[in-house]
Amino acid sequence: MPVHHRRISIGFQGGHSLALRVIEEQLEELYRALDGGGWHELETEDGPVRLYLGQVVYIRAENDDQRVGFSV
């Protein structure tokens, strides 16, 4: 069964953002790690990314149902 990656955007103080694709378990670990602050390693589709959570302002996770074209 193929692994499904979810698109997320992580916003940082100063206005920069980082777009990544992660599996659901990694997203849940990131949410839990936010309370602790400090550094967190996130395994993404393209490889590991280390984030300093003290600078994170927001995390936006897109829904799984992506639509292309015209739909009703």
List the predicted regions and their residue ranges.
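Eukaryotic intrinsically disordered, low-complexity regulatory linkers and tails enriched in Ser/Thr/Pro
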Residues: M1-V72
